[in-house]
């Protein structure tokens, strides 16, 4: 099995805890490449972890301090794609544009994305390549959760609400009982649906 990659910070925590007058904080983060700008010997990428996104500044000589520059020239510039998982070790700083970022000192490739993601691109405030087709979003929910941040937030809020309600009712002595639900469209995985008719609505078929 692959070795575990140990992290010690999340993107949102790094931004919230950053102080300009403090000593540079060394962090280890991991996430998915959501965008990148390659400019010769230096590049910027946007890394997304389970909490949010943060910018990473990568230079060839920092991640390749020896004479061998293959990690930057070949792996990073040519082989890595949007959607790939990488690990970054470095220190936190603020760029000249005022954005809190990580200055990478070590890059580790963690996992390759088999298929390219429909990453949303912005230019002059206009979004391009948006993954907003309703049918595709429901059929490929895993992609929807990756590229559309609001969807993940909705699921997290829903899980929190259900967990809180269940805990409160359980503490009050209630018992949770699962009951079957009738619907007009048959469904299910391995279960065989049956047909019934509501007494008051004989013209309706329920499954």
Question: In which residue ranges do the predicted regions lie?
Answer:
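Class II aminoacyl-tRNA synthetase catalytic cores and aaRS-like
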Residues: 1-205
């Amino acid at each position: 099995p692959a070795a575990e990659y140990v992290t010690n910070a999340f993107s949102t925590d790094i931004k919230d805890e950053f102080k300009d007058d403090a000593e540079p904080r060394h962090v280890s983060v991991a996430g998915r490449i959501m965008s990148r700008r390659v400019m010769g010997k230096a590049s910027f990428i946007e890394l997304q972890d389970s909490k949010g996104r943060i910018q990473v500044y990568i230079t060839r000589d920092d991640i390749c301090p020896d004479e061998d520059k293959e990690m930057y020239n070949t792996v990073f510039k040519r082989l890595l794609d949007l959607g790939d998982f990488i690990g970054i070790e470095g220190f936190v700083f603020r760029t000249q544009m005022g954005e809190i970022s990580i200055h990478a000192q070590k890059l580790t490739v963690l996992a390759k994305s088999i298929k390219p993601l429909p990453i949303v691109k912005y230019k002059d405030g206009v979004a391009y390549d948006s993954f907003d087709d309703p049918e595709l979003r429901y059929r490929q929910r895993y992609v929807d959760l990756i590229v559309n941040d609001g969807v993940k937030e909705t699921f997290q809020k829903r899980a929190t609400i259900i967990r809180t309600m269940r805990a409160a009712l359980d503490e009050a002595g209630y018992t949770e009982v699962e009951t079957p639900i009738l619907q007009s469209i048959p469904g299910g995985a391995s279960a065989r649906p049956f047909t019934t008719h509501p007494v008051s609505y004989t013209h309706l078929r329920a499954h």
